[in-house]
Amino acid sequence: MLSLIWTIFFLHVAIYVVNTAGASTIDSLLWLLYLKLPTSTSKNAREQSRLKREALELKRDMNNTSSQDEFAKWAKLRRRHDKTMDEYEQLNKTLTAQKSSFDWSVKIARWLSTNGLKIFLQFWYSKTPVFALPEAWIPYYVQWILSFPRAPMGSVSVHVWNSVCATAVSVTAEMVTSMFLQTARPTPVATAQKTQ
């Protein structure tokens, strides 16, 4: 099992990745993956896209047919189009309700697996030292701050380690991003031309 040091560190890496990628992006990706599974929801989504294509084809055919010259054909296309649109709207309502329920479930699972786990670890290990500091290395008042609120004196508390990990992850990510952007930017090359 991972030690408490690494558990908290990897938790903050996961929180940073979720915050950087964006919750809505992750939700959309999970929804698309969910629609690939063999469920009734994915069947409804396929049926909805089929009905949408059919409605667009019927609308195109209606626009290509003259309502005055070929009224019978146009009226038949209009009835089929209206029926297809009604079916499409019913499926769309169903899928919208299922997607909102799915988004709510994913949001709860994401919160529980990131921030909820962080709060749980802070509560559960509040009296447990993450690691001990060497004797007489630092003054008493600094030891008190590092062990705040409930860890034994001379150790680092979970709360302080959480703050250190969050700061370290965000600063490291900023450094890596700036180095990547600096190396990815093309350097201007001066070209000299001879003048005569």
Curated annotation (Swiss-Prot):
Membrane topology, from the record: Multi-pass membrane protein
GO molecular function: protein-membrane adaptor activity
Native species: Aspergillus oryzae (strain ATCC 42149 / RIB 40) (Yellow koji mold)
Pfam families recorded: CHD5 (PF04420)
Lumenal compartment residues: 1-4, 132-155
Name of encoding gene: get1
One GO cellular component term noted in the UniProt record for this chain: GET complex
Residues on Cytoplasmic side: 25-110, 173-196
Gene3D superfamilies hit by this protein: Helix hairpin bin
Protein family membership: Belongs to the WRB/GET1 family.
UniProtKB keywords: Coiled coil, Endoplasmic reticulum, Membrane, Transmembrane, Transmembrane helix, Transport
GO terms (BP aspect): tail-anchored membrane protein insertion into ER membrane
The name this protein goes by in its record: Protein get1
Coiled-coil residue windows: 43-100
InterPro entries: Get1 (IPR028945), Get1_fungi (IPR027538), Helix_hairpin_bin_sf (IPR029012)
Cell location: Endoplasmic reticulum membrane
Subunit-level organization: Interacts with get3.
Known role: Required for the post-translational delivery of tail-anchored (TA) proteins to the endoplasmic reticulum. Acts as a membrane receptor for soluble get3, which recognizes and selectively binds the transmembrane domain of TA proteins in the cytosol.
Superkingdom: Eukaryota
Transmembrane portions of the chain: 5-24, 111-131, 156-172
